[in-house]
Amino acid sequence: MMRTAKLHGAAFFLTLLVSVTLVSSSLASSDMSPERQTTMEAEISAFQSGIDALGHDWIAGETSRMRMTPEERRATLMHDLEPFNGDVGIPYVMTEDRSGDRSLLDWRNNGGNFVTGIQDQGSCGSCWVFGAVAALESAFLFAIDGGDVVNLNMSEQYPLSCISNGWGCGGGWGQNVLNYARNSGMLDDDCMPYQESDTVPCGDHCSDTQYRDYYYGNYGVVCYTANTTSIKNALLNYGPLYTTMDIYENFNSY
Protein backbone atom coordinates (compact mmCIF):
# COMPACT_ATOMS: atom_id res chain seq x y z
CA MET A 1 0.00 0.00 0.00
CA MET A 2 1.45 3.38 -0.99
CA ARG A 3 1.42 5.94 1.81
CA THR A 4 1.11 9.62 1.00
CA ALA A 5 1.29 12.82 3.01
CA LYS A 6 1.34 16.47 2.07
CA LEU A 7 4.40 18.10 3.58
CA HIS A 8 2.81 21.50 4.14
CA GLY A 9 3.61 21.02 7.82
CA ALA A 10 7.36 20.46 7.67
CA ALA A 11 8.48 24.02 7.19
CA PHE A 12 12.07 24.53 8.21
CA PHE A 13 14.31 27.41 9.12
CA LEU A 14 18.04 27.74 8.50
CA THR A 15 20.32 29.79 10.71
CA LEU A 16 24.08 29.39 10.89
CA LEU A 17 26.62 27.08 9.38
CA VAL A 18 27.24 24.25 11.82
CA SER A 19 24.64 21.63 12.61
CA VAL A 20 24.66 18.89 15.21
CA THR A 21 22.42 15.99 16.04
CA LEU A 22 23.22 14.70 19.51
CA VAL A 23 24.00 11.01 19.49
CA SER A 24 23.49 8.32 22.08
CA SER A 25 26.91 6.80 22.30
CA SER A 26 27.32 3.34 23.74
CA LEU A 27 30.76 4.24 25.07
CA ALA A 28 30.58 4.26 28.85
CA SER A 29 33.11 5.86 31.17
CA SER A 30 34.43 2.44 32.11
CA ASP A 31 35.25 1.77 28.44
CA MET A 32 37.53 4.80 28.12
CA SER A 33 41.25 4.64 28.62
CA PRO A 34 42.61 6.35 31.75
CA GLU A 35 44.25 8.94 29.51
CA ARG A 36 40.97 9.76 27.75
CA GLN A 37 39.14 9.93 31.09
CA THR A 38 41.70 12.41 32.42
CA THR A 39 41.52 14.52 29.26
CA MET A 40 37.72 14.58 29.38
CA GLU A 41 37.67 15.65 33.01
CA ALA A 42 40.13 18.45 32.24
CA GLU A 43 37.95 19.62 29.33
CA ILE A 44 34.84 19.67 31.52
CA SER A 45 36.68 21.59 34.24
CA ALA A 46 37.87 24.18 31.72
CA PHE A 47 34.35 24.53 30.29
CA GLN A 48 32.91 25.04 33.78
CA SER A 49 35.47 27.73 34.56
CA GLY A 50 34.45 29.58 31.42
CA ILE A 51 30.75 29.20 32.21
CA ASP A 52 31.26 30.52 35.73
CA ALA A 53 33.35 33.44 34.48
CA LEU A 54 30.48 34.51 32.21
CA GLY A 55 27.96 34.26 35.03
CA HIS A 56 25.91 31.50 33.42
CA ASP A 57 24.09 29.02 35.64
CA TRP A 58 24.38 25.69 33.86
CA ILE A 59 26.72 22.87 34.85
CA ALA A 60 29.08 21.18 32.41
CA GLY A 61 29.20 17.43 32.78
CA GLU A 62 29.99 14.08 31.23
CA THR A 63 27.89 13.31 28.15
CA SER A 64 28.08 10.86 25.28
CA ARG A 65 29.72 13.58 23.19
CA MET A 66 32.29 14.39 25.87
CA ARG A 67 33.29 10.72 25.86
CA MET A 68 34.25 11.12 22.21
CA THR A 69 37.64 12.44 21.22
CA PRO A 70 37.66 15.94 19.67
CA GLU A 71 38.26 14.31 16.29
CA GLU A 72 35.26 12.02 16.71
CA ARG A 73 33.05 14.97 17.66
CA ARG A 74 34.18 16.96 14.67
CA ALA A 75 33.37 14.06 12.36
CA THR A 76 29.69 14.29 13.37
CA LEU A 77 29.37 17.99 12.48
CA MET A 78 28.81 19.97 9.30
CA HIS A 79 32.08 21.84 9.59
CA ASP A 80 33.42 22.55 6.10
CA LEU A 81 30.33 23.50 4.08
CA GLU A 82 30.08 26.57 1.93
CA PRO A 83 27.76 29.23 3.44
CA PHE A 84 24.14 28.44 2.67
CA ASN A 85 22.62 30.56 -0.08
CA GLY A 86 19.05 31.22 0.99
CA ASP A 87 17.99 32.37 -2.46
CA VAL A 88 17.28 28.92 -3.90
CA GLY A 89 13.63 29.32 -4.82
CA ILE A 90 12.19 27.79 -1.65
CA PRO A 91 8.95 29.62 -0.80
CA TYR A 92 8.62 31.37 2.52
CA VAL A 93 5.89 30.05 4.80
CA MET A 94 3.62 32.63 6.37
CA THR A 95 2.60 31.62 9.88
CA GLU A 96 -0.42 32.71 11.84
CA ASP A 97 0.50 34.42 15.12
CA ARG A 98 -0.65 31.90 17.71
CA SER A 99 2.22 32.04 20.20
CA GLY A 100 0.63 34.43 22.69
CA ASP A 101 2.03 33.88 26.16
CA ARG A 102 2.57 30.16 25.69
CA SER A 103 5.90 29.05 27.15
CA LEU A 104 5.63 25.27 26.75
CA LEU A 105 4.84 23.03 23.79
CA ASP A 106 5.50 19.30 23.69
CA TRP A 107 4.46 17.66 20.41
CA ARG A 108 4.86 14.24 22.02
CA ASN A 109 1.72 14.98 24.02
CA ASN A 110 -0.37 17.61 22.31
CA GLY A 111 -3.53 15.94 21.05
CA GLY A 112 -1.39 12.97 20.02
CA ASN A 113 2.25 12.03 19.66
CA PHE A 114 3.83 13.63 16.60
CA VAL A 115 7.50 12.96 17.40
CA THR A 116 9.44 9.79 16.62
CA GLY A 117 12.19 8.29 18.76
CA ILE A 118 15.76 9.48 19.28
CA GLN A 119 18.23 8.21 16.68
CA ASP A 120 22.00 7.73 16.69
CA GLN A 121 23.97 9.02 13.70
CA GLY A 122 27.11 7.30 14.96
CA SER A 123 30.46 8.46 13.62
CA CYS A 124 29.08 9.76 10.31
CA GLY A 125 28.45 13.51 9.94
CA SER A 126 24.91 12.88 8.72
CA CYS A 127 23.05 15.21 11.08
CA TRP A 128 21.68 17.07 8.04
CA VAL A 129 19.88 13.86 7.04
CA PHE A 130 18.70 12.88 10.51
CA GLY A 131 17.22 16.31 11.27
CA ALA A 132 15.33 16.45 7.98
CA VAL A 133 14.08 12.85 8.21
CA ALA A 134 12.78 13.51 11.74
CA ALA A 135 10.80 16.48 10.39
CA LEU A 136 9.45 14.28 7.58
CA GLU A 137 8.36 11.66 10.10
CA SER A 138 6.54 14.28 12.17
CA ALA A 139 4.85 15.66 9.04
CA PHE A 140 3.54 12.19 8.22
CA LEU A 141 2.21 11.77 11.77
CA PHE A 142 0.49 15.16 11.44
CA ALA A 143 -1.12 14.05 8.18
CA ILE A 144 -2.71 11.05 9.90
CA ASP A 145 -3.51 12.94 13.13
CA GLY A 146 -0.67 11.45 15.16
CA GLY A 147 0.13 8.21 16.85
CA ASP A 148 -1.52 5.84 14.35
CA VAL A 149 1.71 4.43 12.91
CA VAL A 150 3.47 2.19 15.40
CA ASN A 151 7.24 2.72 15.50
CA LEU A 152 7.36 4.90 12.38
CA ASN A 153 11.01 4.92 11.32
CA MET A 154 12.04 6.22 7.90
CA SER A 155 15.39 5.39 6.36
CA GLU A 156 18.19 7.91 6.84
CA GLN A 157 20.47 5.72 4.74
CA TYR A 158 18.24 6.13 1.67
CA PRO A 159 18.81 9.89 1.19
CA LEU A 160 22.37 9.65 2.54
CA SER A 161 23.26 7.15 -0.21
CA CYS A 162 21.13 8.56 -3.00
CA ILE A 163 21.42 12.36 -2.81
CA SER A 164 24.12 13.56 -5.18
CA ASN A 165 24.19 17.22 -4.12
CA GLY A 166 25.38 16.57 -0.57
CA TRP A 167 28.66 15.63 1.05
CA GLY A 168 27.53 12.40 2.68
CA CYS A 169 29.21 11.94 6.04
CA GLY A 170 30.93 15.29 5.46
CA GLY A 171 27.68 17.22 5.82
CA GLY A 172 24.96 18.72 3.68
CA TRP A 173 21.85 20.87 3.78
CA GLY A 174 18.53 19.46 4.92
CA GLN A 175 16.51 21.03 2.11
CA ASN A 176 18.23 18.53 -0.21
CA VAL A 177 16.63 15.74 1.82
CA LEU A 178 13.23 17.46 1.69
CA ASN A 179 13.60 17.91 -2.07
CA TYR A 180 14.47 14.23 -2.41
CA ALA A 181 11.43 13.19 -0.36
CA ARG A 182 9.19 15.35 -2.53
CA ASN A 183 10.62 14.10 -5.83
CA SER A 184 11.53 10.48 -5.07
CA GLY A 185 9.73 9.55 -1.87
CA MET A 186 11.13 7.93 1.26
CA LEU A 187 11.60 4.34 2.38
CA ASP A 188 11.30 2.82 5.84
CA ASP A 189 14.40 1.89 7.81
CA ASP A 190 13.78 -1.86 7.56
CA CYS A 191 13.95 -1.51 3.77
CA MET A 192 17.31 0.28 3.90
CA PRO A 193 18.88 0.24 7.38
CA TYR A 194 21.34 2.90 8.48
CA GLN A 195 25.01 1.84 8.22
CA GLU A 196 26.94 5.00 9.24
CA SER A 197 28.46 5.19 5.76
CA ASP A 198 27.99 7.26 2.61
CA THR A 199 29.50 4.53 0.40
CA VAL A 200 26.45 2.26 0.55
CA PRO A 201 25.04 2.02 -3.02
CA CYS A 202 21.78 3.87 -3.61
CA GLY A 203 20.13 0.69 -4.87
CA ASP A 204 21.10 -1.40 -1.84
CA HIS A 205 17.55 -1.57 -0.45
CA CYS A 206 14.65 -4.03 -0.30
CA SER A 207 12.94 -5.07 -3.51
CA ASP A 208 9.31 -4.30 -2.65
CA THR A 209 9.70 -0.52 -2.48
CA GLN A 210 6.41 0.09 -4.29
CA TYR A 211 4.59 -1.09 -1.16
CA ARG A 212 6.55 0.93 1.39
CA ASP A 213 7.07 4.40 -0.11
CA TYR A 214 6.24 7.66 1.65
CA TYR A 215 5.54 10.59 -0.69
CA TYR A 216 5.38 14.26 0.23
CA GLY A 217 4.14 17.55 -1.20
CA ASN A 218 5.78 20.93 -0.86
CA TYR A 219 7.73 22.47 1.98
CA GLY A 220 8.77 26.00 2.85
CA VAL A 221 11.20 28.08 4.85
CA VAL A 222 10.29 30.01 7.99
CA CYS A 223 13.45 32.11 8.34
CA TYR A 224 17.12 31.96 7.37
CA THR A 225 18.29 33.77 10.49
CA ALA A 226 16.85 33.11 13.91
CA ASN A 227 13.55 34.90 14.54
CA THR A 228 12.03 33.73 17.81
CA THR A 229 8.47 34.82 17.04
CA SER A 230 8.44 33.22 13.59
CA ILE A 231 9.92 30.00 14.92
CA LYS A 232 7.41 29.75 17.79
CA ASN A 233 4.52 30.41 15.41
CA ALA A 234 5.83 27.81 12.96
CA LEU A 235 6.17 25.22 15.73
CA LEU A 236 2.56 25.86 16.70
CA ASN A 237 1.25 25.90 13.11
CA TYR A 238 3.34 23.16 11.51
CA GLY A 239 4.91 21.11 14.28
CA PRO A 240 8.58 20.05 14.64
CA LEU A 241 10.98 21.89 12.32
CA TYR A 242 14.23 21.09 10.56
CA THR A 243 16.83 23.56 11.83
CA THR A 244 20.55 24.20 11.91
CA MET A 245 22.43 25.80 14.76
CA ASP A 246 25.87 27.15 15.51
CA ILE A 247 27.54 25.53 18.49
CA TYR A 248 30.54 26.11 20.73
CA GLU A 249 32.80 23.45 22.19
CA ASN A 250 31.19 23.59 25.64
CA PHE A 251 27.84 22.61 24.10
CA ASN A 252 29.16 19.05 24.05
CA SER A 253 29.12 19.03 27.85
CA TYR A 254 25.57 20.40 28.23
Language-model segment annotations:
Residues 27-254:
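Catalytic-core signature of thiol
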Residues 2, 20-23:
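Short hydrophobic transmembrane-like helices used for membrane targeting/insertion
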Residues 2-12:
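Bacterial N-terminal signal peptides that target proteins for export
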Residues 11-21:
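Bacterial N-terminal signal peptides
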Residues 15, 26-27:
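Cleavable N-terminal signal peptides
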